[in-house]
């Protein structure tokens, strides 16, 4: 199966006064974390500076308002997915997946999404340098998440 939870998922947006090109399809790379920044941007509401007496941490998401308005929007340089046991990182055509299937040793899987969008052929063993580079990014990200504490 693929590891695109919340990433490669259709979204239907209805906003007659804001979306000018009705019926348009966008292939903008996005994630669920982009919804809050998009809503705030569309409503011109500024996020609170503090939450519970603590400074608000920077959100992972970005506003998709430009895409909704028919403008070209570059894909994020890196996109993280972390839910339950599913973990993945997308960077350009690459996807690094931390696989922890029951009964198997936890390991990294690497997919070339440009040539294998269904994530069939794991390239981790034939491209260990790419795995190492992306794993380093992932591990730095994990430290940030752990330092934030539990949700």
Task: Show where each model-derived region lies.
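C-terminal cap/loop subdomain of S1 sulfatases and analogous C-terminal strand-loop tails that border
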Residues: 1-5, 19-28, 32-113, 141-150
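Short beta-strand-to-turn element immediately C-terminal to the catalytic PLP-Schiff-base lysine
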Residues: 13-14
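Catalytic cores of eukaryotic secretory-pathway lumenal/extracellular enzymes that build
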Residues: 8-9
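Active-site-proximal N-terminal segment of extracellular/periplasmic enzymes that hydrolyze or transfer
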Residues: 121-129
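Short amphipathic alpha-helical coupling segments at ligand-binding clamshell hinges
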Residues: 130-134
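Intrinsically disordered, low-complexity polar regions and short flexible loop motifs
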Residues: 116
């Amino acid at each position: 199966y693929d590891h695109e939870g919340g990433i490669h998922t259709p979204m239907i947006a209805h906003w007659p006064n804001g979306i000018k090109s009705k019926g348009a399809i966008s292939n903008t790379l996005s994630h669920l974390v982009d919804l809050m920044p998009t809503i705030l941007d569309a409503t011109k509401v500024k996020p609170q500076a503090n939450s519970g007496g603590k400074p608000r941490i920077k959100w992972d998401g970005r506003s998709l308002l430009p895409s909704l308005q028919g403008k070209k929007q570059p894909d994020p340089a890196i996109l993280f997915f972390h839910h339950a046991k599913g973990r993945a990182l997308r960077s350009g055509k690459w996807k690094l997946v931390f696989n922890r299937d029951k009964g198997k040793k936890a390991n990294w899987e690497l997919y070339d999404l440009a040539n294998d969008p269904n994530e069939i052929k794991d390239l981790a063993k034939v491209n260990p340098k790419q795995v190492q580079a992306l794993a380093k990014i992932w591990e730095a990200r994990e430290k940030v998440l752990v330092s934030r504490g539990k949700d």
